[in-house]
Amino acid sequence: MLKNDLFLRALKRQPCSRTPIWVMRQAGRYLPEYRAVREKTDFLTLCKTPELAAEVTIQPVDLMGVDAAIIFSDILVVNEAMGMDVEIIESKGIRLSPAIRSQVDIDRLIIPDINEKLGYVMDAIRLTKKELDNRVPLIGFSGAAWTLFTYAVEGGGSKNYAFAKKMMYREPKMAHMLLSKISSVITEYVLMQIEAGADAIQIFDSWASALSEDDYREFALPYIKENVQAIKTKYPDTPVIVFSKDCNTILSEIADTGCDAMGLGWNMDIAKARKELNDRVCIQGNMDPTVLYGTPDKIRSEAAKILKQFGQHTATSGHVFNLGHGILPDVDPANLKLLVEFVKEESVKYH
């Protein structure tokens, strides 16, 4: 039995004594303890070494008091498992090769044996669960098909997604073939994470805002729904969070995927989102990550505002406090600790 199950209760929209909190990229460079581990090895080796991945996954639980851990990994391990070379060079960026630009390139990508290619993630999950000793839940995750597609086709990050959109608009069947291939791997990957012990899954569609509403409906949402429905069919009790960054105009359609919770970017009023969704799903978010550069008073006032905007809880509401995107690497850890402690205290009156 979990000693602290507030995060899972909130995702399932069950009564909670307060609002749970964790933050995206909470195991990361803002922590001196993470940097000490990271100095010994490169980023991908850290992801692939279960003992080290477990250590950094647990750091924010020990140091910050967050209500959930998220397994330390990277969304691009899926691309790598499918046969792409992935280089992640902090401060320089991401390179994937060869970029996927033709039918021949798509055919060359493999549907991997997840245990063989991504077994290190499952080992890290099992080890982390053991070391957490039921203190808090553990989140598993994957990138969404559209986001992984953009990295594959662009060969890295991009400002305007020219190659990805060129394939979408000139060769839509080819684009769907690649998206479908990626999505099938994502589905197997997240199911195996749950089998290994993940208590919840988050699907990150980090580049969702690059698409128009209509294009998102065609090239992104069907694959997210495919992933969510596969999880719900096999593991109906495992909550799923969908984080489609800045897709504020189609919130109800994202909820229609069958997800339990929706991550919200910071440019959406959480009160409006709750009103539109009518407590059909839990809402996760949504403080601007740069607020953590502010004074203690500013951090407290912004957090208080979000809690107040979400408002009083009902028997069917759910809110997980988080940032609207990942914590930035040069944030003072003391500011995150202050935020966590404040949310724990301030949120009680809304429950």
From Swiss-Prot:
It catalyses: uroporphyrinogen III + 4 H(+) = coproporphyrinogen III + 4 CO2. The record marks 74 as: Transition state stabilizer. Pfam families: URO-D. One of its GO terms (biological process) is protoporphyrinogen IX biosynthetic process. It is found in: Cytoplasm. Substrate binds at residues 25-29, 74, 151, 206, 325. The keyword Lyase applies. The keyword Cytoplasm applies. GO terms for cellular component: cytosol. Its EC number is 4.1.1.37. Keywords: Cytoplasm, Decarboxylase, Lyase, Porphyrin biosynthesis. Gene3D superfamilies: 3.20.20.210. GO terms for molecular function: uroporphyrinogen decarboxylase activity. Pathway: Porphyrin-containing compound metabolism; protoporphyrin-IX biosynthesis; coproporphyrinogen-III from 5-aminolevulinate: step 4/4. It comes from the Bacteria. CDD domains: URO-D (cd00717). Homodimer. Catalyzes the decarboxylation of four acetate groups of uroporphyrinogen-III to yield coproporphyrinogen-III. Belongs to the uroporphyrinogen decarboxylase family. This is Uroporphyrinogen decarboxylase. It comes from Chlorobium phaeobacteroides (strain DSM 266 / SMG 266 / 2430). The lineage of its organism: Bacteria, Pseudomonadati, Chlorobiota, Chlorobiia, Chlorobiales. The gene is hemE.
